[in-house]
């Protein structure tokens, strides 16, 4: 039977399912490249159909979002269901293979659902349905449980060293692999990223396991502490200063909702002002974003400059970078979330937010290459952009972990999993 005959032989239900999946795949690509500002009309055009025809399959953009997030959670749950973890592996190598295989599966799943994954990092748009809110806030408990089982099996097989908080390590492992879908790594194959990241988490980036007492006294760590002291301690804003007040409100809204879907109307409502008043004070949403991020960028750059310019080993600098990121997370959480979204995709009308990411990558690549040359660092092809991006990702401790175990606990966690690795040496 030819292609035309096969198409005619498909039942109406199969045809509808296939067409819906085509629309969902197209919408996912558009959301991933242009954000949630993509309209139904743009989705219809990309699908080669009229907007009216799209409504035969989905009655709203939210309906598409709901199904995209449902597909993501369903696929991630299937990854957890498919994995067969042996509680007592034959050897440490077998235990490591279990962990790495699961890590790769999570990364592949995340890469295939980037738009839905990114959506779960923010609050749903204003007026979202209860179903969409519930889906966006759903935790990936099944995959965390599967990873925890694999790590516990690794401990039984004498791969994983004792004394680690394995539920926290499991959460970190899963989040690190899920971040592969956030496009920080751009076009790099998910398996390649997962190989580097799981290798670091298991065996550490440091050739020799560093002592925490020595790291606390490093020039890099002390330099970051001095930079953090210069940051303002209070977020209290004088509401009579409308420009400062609007920046404060917009910072929260951009961090909570995401820049792309936050409107001037949303900012005005949150600030208790009229939309016209907001425009008169800030000019445009883009100008407001730039002014918010400029201060954050200057402080972050000062921190990285202090780290990379210190008289310290590469390992000491990476440890200090983790402490910098932990403090950034605590003090500039909204800006941090906005920055992550910007690294995924810079809106074309905003040429720069002030953060010199290419320059940071260049400096870090040189530092990593020097660390490998000095036999302080274990990292394949350290001078590549991918290696630097993987290292930057490892310096970011997930926000929920920082909140759960505190700043110093998060620093110890970073030293345990990033610098030393969880495997016995």
Predicted features, each with a name:
Residues 70-77, 294-301:
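Short, basic, alpha-helical segments at the C-terminal edge of helix-turn-helix-like DNA-binding modules
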Residues 129-157, 166-170, 174, 178, ...:
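Amphipathic alpha-helical packing segments from all-alpha helical-bundle domains
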Residues 67, 81-116, 166, 306-331:
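Hydrophobic alpha-helical connector segments
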Residues 22, 26, 30-67, 71, ...:
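Helix-turn-helix
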Residues 327-424:
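C-terminal structured domain segments across diverse proteins
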Residues 36-37, 160, 377-378:
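Conserved hydrophobic residue
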Residues 107-134, 148, 329-351, 399-400:
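Amphipathic alpha-helical segments used for helix-helix packing
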Residues 1-10, 108, 145, 149-157, ...:
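C-terminal peripheral helix-coil segments that are non-catalytic and often amphipathic
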């Amino acid at each position: 039977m030819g292609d035309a005959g096969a198409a005619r032989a498909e039942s109406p239900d199969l045809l509808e399912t296939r067409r819906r999946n085509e629309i969902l795949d197209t919408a996912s690509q558009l959301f991933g490249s242009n954000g949630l500002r993509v309209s139904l009309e743009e989705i219809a055009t990309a699908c080669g159909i009229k907007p009216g025809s799209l409504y035969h399959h989905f009655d709203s953009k939210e309906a598409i979002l709901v199904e995209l997030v449902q597909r993501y959670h369903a696929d991630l749950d299937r990854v957890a269901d498919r994995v067969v973890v042996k509680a007592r592996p034959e050897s440490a190598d077998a235990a490591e293979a279990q962990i790495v295989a699961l890590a790769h599966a999570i990364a592949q799943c995340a890469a295939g659902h980037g738009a839905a994954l990114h959506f779960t990092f923010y609050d749903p748009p204003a007026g979202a349905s209860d179903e969409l809110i519930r889906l966006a806030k759903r935790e990936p408990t099944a995959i965390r449980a599967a990873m925890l089982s694999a790590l516990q099996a690794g401990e039984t097989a004498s791969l994983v060293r004792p004394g680690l908080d394995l539920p926290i390590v499991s959460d970190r492992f899963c989040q690190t692999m899920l971040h592969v879908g956030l496009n920080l790594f751009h076009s790099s194959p998910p398996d390649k990223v997962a190989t580097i990241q799981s290798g670091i988490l298991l065996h550490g980036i440091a050739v020799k396991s560093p002592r925490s007492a020595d790291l606390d006294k490093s020039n890099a760590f002390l330099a970051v502490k001095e930079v953090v002291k210069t940051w303002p301690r209070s977020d209290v804003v004088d509401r009579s200063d409308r420009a400062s007040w609007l920046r404060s409100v917009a910072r929260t809204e951009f961090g909570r909702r995401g820049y792309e879907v936050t409107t001037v109307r949303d900012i005005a409502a949150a600030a208790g002002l009229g939309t016209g008043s907001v425009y008169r004070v800030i000019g445009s949403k883009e100008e407001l974003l730039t002014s918010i991020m400029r201060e954050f960028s200057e402080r972050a750059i000062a921190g990285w400059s202090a780290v990379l310019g210190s008289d310290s080993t590469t390992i000491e600098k990476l440890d200090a970078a983790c402490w910098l990121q932990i403090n950034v997370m605590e003090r500039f959480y909204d800006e941090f979330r906005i920055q992550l979204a910007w690294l995924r995709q810079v809106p074309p009308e905003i040429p720069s937010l002030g953060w010199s990411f290419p320059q940071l990558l260049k400096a870090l690549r040189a530092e990593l290459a020097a660390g490998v040359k000095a036999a302080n660092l274990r990292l394949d092809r350290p001078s590549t952009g991918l290696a630097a991006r993987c290292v930057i990702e490892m310096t970011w401790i997930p926000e929920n972990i920082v909140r759960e175990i505190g700043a110093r606990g998060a620093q110890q966690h970073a030293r345990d999993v990033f610098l030393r690795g969880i495997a016995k040496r």
